[in-house]
A protein has these predicted regions:
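Long, C-terminal-biased catalytic regions of enzyme "large/alpha" subunits
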Residues: 1-482
Length: 482
C-alpha cells in the first residue's frame, strides 16, 4: 500500500470518526515543533545517590517530565530498606523517604509551570522489606503521588497475612493500585507506567492512539485497527524523543499502544447487550464453551478478532515488541462521537452513567451524553469482568499486549485474598481505581464519577488524554499518560 493511499485512508477514517488520537498526538501531527506526542514515562531508580540512573538523576528526570506535562512512574524497589548500613558509616533512609521528594516535586512544578497536569506514581515490589511502610504511608505525607505495589503470584503467596491485610485495605480505601511484574520477549523486566496500561523499559515513553469503536460499523473495525496501528508505527519512527537526552531512542524502545474506546456505544448501536457480547466472546475464545450466542454479538467479536489480528501483523512486521494498550480515556472520549452523534464512552467498560456534567474551572460546565448505552449498574460486575477478561485474552494471544487500566468496583466486590488470587491468574495486568458504580452509592471522591478539575490530586482521575490542555488550576491533576 503506497504512502499516498495510506494518507487518504487516514484522512477518510479520521473524518469518519473511527480513529481517536490523543490530544498530544494530534497537536504534534499539526505542529511537529510543539510538545512531543509521547505522554508518560518510567524511571527505575538505582541504589545510589549519583550516577546516570541514581537518585539524583531521577529527580532531574521527574522534573523534566513534569515540566512538560508528562506522567512519571518511579520504581523504587532497588533502593535499600530503611536502616541498612552500607558498611561505610552511612545508613539508608529507605525508598519511602525519597517518595516524599517526588511528591513535593510534583506539587511545586504543577504550581509554577505552564503545563500543570503531570502525575507521579511510586512503585514498590511486594517483597521489598519496606512494603508495609510504603502501603501504610498517610496521604498527607505524599499528597501529590499515587502508590502502586508490583507483584507476582509467588510474591503474593509468600506475603505475610499482615502485609496482605494492609494491601487489601489500601485498595479498598483507594490508596493502593496493583501491577503484575512483567517481562518482555527476551526475559528482561519491563515496568508499569502511571496509568498502568503500558509497560516500559526505564526511560521508555508511550505513544498511544485508540480505535473509536462507537464510530465503527462491525465491517469498519478491521480497517480502523489496521490504520491506527500503521499510523502509530509511522509516528514512532519520527518522534525524536531521544533528542531530549532523557528518553530512550526509538531503536531501543520498540513499542506503541493501540487501544479502544466506545465499546458501550457500539454494542448499543448494534442492539447487543454486554451479557450477549460476553457469551459471544467465550464462545469464540474457548472451544469447550457452550453458549447460546446472539449472531449480532458474534459478528462484533469476529470483527474485533480480525482487527486485532490485522494490527498485530502490522506491528510484528515492523519489529514492535508491544503494540496494544487499553488506557483510561475519559478526556479523549469526550472529543469523539459515535455513529448516532452521541459522545463515546471511555475505553471498553460500561460507563457509570449516561449523562456526564464536567465541571471545569478552565472551560466551565460541559455536558456529555453517551446515548442509550448500558451502564455499569445495569451490566453488573460478573458480566463486566467476563467482557474485559475476554478482550484482554484476545490481546494477550498476540504476544504484543502491554495491558489494561482495569478498574474494580468497590461497592460491588469485596477485596479478599481470594479476589487477588483470581486477578493474578486472569489476563488482567493491573488493578487501577476502585470505583463506586451503583447510582445510590457514588461519592464525591469517586475517581470516575466526574472529572472535576478542583479535586485534590489524591482523588483525581489519572486519564491518559488530558495532557494536551494548558491548565491554570493549582491542584488539578488532569492525568498522565497517553
Amino acid at each position: 500500500m503506497g504512502f499516498s493511499h495510506l494518507q487518504k485512508l487516514f484522512t477518510t477514517l479520521m473524518e469518519n470518526n473511527v480513529i481517536a488520537r490523543t490530544g498530544r498526538v494530534q497537536s504534534w501531527i499539526d505542529d511537529p515543533n510543539s510538545r512531543l506526542p509521547v505522554s508518560c514515562t518510567v524511571f527505575v531508580v538505582e541504589d545510589s545517590m549519583e550516577g546516570p540512573n541514581g537518585i539524583e538523576a531521577s529527580w532531574r528526570f521527574v522534573s523534566h517530565a513534569l515540566r512538560y506535562g508528562a506522567g512519571v512512574a518511579v520504581h523504587l524497589s532497588n533502593i535499600r530498606p530503611a536502616g541498612t548500613d552500607n558498611g561505610q558509616g552511612l545508613v539508608a533512609s529507605g525508598p519511602c523517604s525519597f517518595g516524599k521528594i517526588y511528591s513535593c516535586l510534583n506539587e511545586q512544578l504543577r504550581r509554577g509551570g505552564v503545563y500543570k497536569n503531570g502525575a507521579v506514581v511510586l512503585h514498590l515490589d511486594l517483597n521489598h522489606p519496606d512494603i508495609l511502610e510504603f502501603v501504610n504511608m498517610p496521604r498527607h505525607e505524599i499528597p501529590w503521588a499515587k502508590r502502586c505495589v508490583d507483584l507476582s503470584n509467588v510474591m503474593w503467596d509468600m506475603a505475610t497475612p499482615k502485609v496482605k491485610k494492609a494491601i487489601l485495605e489500601g485498595i479498598a480505601r483507594g490508596d493502593i493500585w496493583l501491577a503484575k511484574i512483567k517481562r518482555d520477549q527476551r526475559g528482561d523486566r519491563i515496568y508499569a507506567n502511571v496509568c498502568l496500561e503500558v509497560f516500559l523499559k526505564s526511560r521508555g515513553t508511550c505513544l498511544l492512539e485508540h480505535v473509536n469503536l462507537g464510530g465503527c460499523r462491525p465491517e469498519d473495525i478491521v480497517g480502523a485497527f489496521s490504520t491506527g496501528m500503521t499510523e502509530l508505527i509511522e509516528l514512532h519512527a519520527k518522534t525524536g524523543v531521544e533528542k531530549t537526552g532523557e528518553y530512550l531512542s526509538q531503536e531501543d524502545d520498540r513499542q506503541v499502544g493501540l487501544g479502544m474506546l466506545g465499546l458501550a456505544n457500539l454494542l448499543a448501536l448494534e442492539g447487543v447487550t454486554y451479557s450477549q457480547f460476553s457469551d459471544a466472546l467465550s464462545h469464540h475464545l474457548y472451544a469447550d464453551a457452550d453458549y447460546l450466542v446472539t449472531p449480532e454479538a458474534l459478528k462484533i467479536v469476529k470483527a474485533l478478532q480480525e482487527g486485532i489480528d490485522a494490527a498485530a501483523s502490522i506491528a510484528k512486521s515492523n519489529n514492535m515488541d508491544r503494540a496494544f494498550a487499553i488506557a483510561p480515556t475519559a478526556s479523549c472520549s469526550y472529543r469523539y462521537k459515535d455513529r448516532a452523534g452521541y459522545t463515546t464512552a471511555p475505553e471498553i467498560a460500561p460507563p457509570i452513567g449516561r449523562l456526564v456534567d464536567r465541571d471545569s474551572s478552565t472551560f466551565g460546565v460541559e455536558h456529555y451524553d453517551y446515548g442509550n448505552v448500558e451502564t455499569a449498574d445495569q451490566v453488573g460486575w460478573d458480566v463486566y469482568k467476563k467482557v474485559v477478561d475476554g478482550i484482554m485474552e484476545m490481546l494477550m494471544r498476540t504476544n504484543l499486549c502491554h495491558g489494561y487500566s482495569y478498574n474494580t468496583w468497590s461497592d460491588v466486590v469485596t477485596y479478599t485474598d481470594h479476589f487477588i488470587d483470581e486477578w493474578l491468574v486472569s489476563p488482567q495486568t493491573s488493578m487501577y481505581y476502585s470505583l463506586q458504580v451503583n447510582q445510590n452509592t457514588q461519592a464525591k471522591d469517586d475517581a470516575m464519577a466526574a472529572l472535576d478539575e478542583t479535586y485534590d490530586f489524591t482523588f483525581s482521575d489519572l486519564d491518559a488524554d488530558d495532557n494536551d490542555v494548558q491548565i491554570e488550576v493549582d491542584n488539578f491533576c488532569s492525568t498522565c499518560a497517553e
